[in-house]
């Protein structure tokens, strides 16, 4: 196969000794070297079948989550678009893993195959940074809902979601290029992801506190406030409810992403045996590429509006597959009844004909 169009850029295939030497010299870890080392190993048929099965299951779960979020009315449309973008960008990992499989199966030259790993690493780290910054985008959207309090719900303002998603895509792509070109190492990546997750959680708490404080003040003094309107009260209630629902999801997703970053490099830094590293890499790689099995159920379960949509459609589907049938229980009668004969209907019909015959009418006259 010819992959020259992918070999514009390439990455160096590092060995375990090189990764450890670089770690001891600089006190930091080159994540791209770790990625190429893990990708340049032998893989089993079991691993191939397992990951592809989990990929199909993850795609199914992802589209269920997107459907539930799209059908929900809470939170605002812009927040739902941001969450959906974070879920759908997971498809980059499917492409990334496909490049790794082609690299492991291909018999082409080293240059063309290393080009495949470059694009695989770029897509992998772009998704990772995009997922982390999605937490900050959700917080920024709630901040805009707090600033534009008077008419945020009545106007779509799709440009807010478009700007946040576009900025997230470009910033994450910049970080991914820096990581692949070895301009930022493991410590820098970890600091960026941790800082973004912590800042998102803190800002979301501040936004929740401000909206909650203003809503309480509005409820206590609604008769005396001159600028009191029902739309402002509704928007404050919406902001408080959305922030309350998003807080646990942001914490869980942020902790999960940071855990994945650490799990990639720790087995090599701690110098585990090759067999242990192989199993650690299999578990980590499978978890990364099938994270919708963790993230999507977490978001749907922790956010009440998404959970209600899912349960509603689940009950509807269950009713269509297995409709509820009311069992009719007939008790045995205490009166003996004989079974009707086959000619019983004919006898009654003849009696009726005789009763309306012309002779019977003449007698009555």
Curated annotation (Swiss-Prot):
GO biological process: sensory perception of chemical stimulus
Xref: InterPro entries: 7TM_GPCR_serpentine_rcpt_Sre (IPR004151)
Record-annotated membrane-spanning stretches: 49-69, 82-102, 116-136, 158-178, 189-209, 250-270, 292-314
Keywords: Membrane, Transmembrane, Transmembrane helix
Subcellular location field: Membrane
GO CC term (a single one): membrane
Topology in the lipid bilayer: Multi-pass membrane protein
Coiled-coil residues: none
Similarity-based family: Belongs to the nematode receptor-like protein sre family.
UniProt name for this protein: Serpentine receptor class epsilon-21
Recorded name of the encoding gene: sre-21
């Amino acid at each position: 196969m010819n992959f020259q169009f992918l070999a514009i850029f390439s990455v160096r295939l590092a060995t375990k000794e090189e990764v450890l030497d670089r770690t001891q010299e600089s006190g930091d870890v080159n994540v791209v070297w770790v990625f190429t080392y893990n990708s340049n190993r032998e893989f089993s048929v079991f691993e191939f079948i397992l990951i592809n099965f989990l990929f199909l299951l993850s795609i199914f779960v992802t589209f269920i989550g997107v459907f539930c979020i799209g059908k929900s009315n809470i939170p605002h449309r812009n927040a739902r678009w941001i969450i959906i973008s974070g879920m759908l960008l997971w498809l980059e990992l499917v492409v990334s893993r496909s490049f790794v499989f082609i690299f492991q199966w291909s018999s082409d030259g080293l240059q063309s195959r290393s080009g495949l790993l470059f694009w695989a690493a770029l897509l992998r780290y772009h998704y990772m940074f995009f997922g982390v910054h999605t937490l900050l985008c959700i917080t920024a959207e709630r901040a805009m809902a707090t600033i534009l309090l008077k008419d945020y719900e009545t106007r779509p303002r799709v440009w807010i979601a478009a700007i946040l998603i576009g900025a997230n895509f470009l910033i994450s792509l910049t970080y991914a290029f820096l990581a692949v070109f070895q301009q930022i190492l493991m410590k820098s990546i970890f600091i960026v992801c941790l800082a973004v997750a912590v800042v998102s959680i803190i800002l979301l708490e501040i936004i929740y506190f401000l909206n909650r404080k203003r809503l309480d003040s509005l409820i206590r003094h609604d008769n005396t406030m001159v600028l009191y309107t029902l739309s402002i009260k509704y928007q404050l209630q919406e902001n408080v409810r959305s922030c309350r629902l998003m807080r646990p999801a942001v914490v869980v997703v942020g902790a999960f992403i940071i855990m994945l970053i650490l799990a990639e490099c720790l087995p090599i830094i701690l110098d585990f045996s090759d067999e242990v590293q192989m199993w650690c890499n299999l578990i980590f790689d499978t978890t990364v590429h099938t994270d919708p099995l963790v993230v999507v159920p977490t978001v749907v379960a922790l956010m009440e509006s998404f959970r209600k949509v899912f349960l509603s459609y689940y009950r509807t589907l269950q009713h269509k597959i297995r409709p509820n049938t009311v069992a009719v229980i007939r008790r045995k009668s205490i009166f003996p009844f004989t079974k009707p004969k086959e000619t019983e209907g004919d006898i009654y019909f003849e009696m009726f004909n005789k009763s309306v015959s012309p002779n019977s009418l003449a007698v009555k006259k």
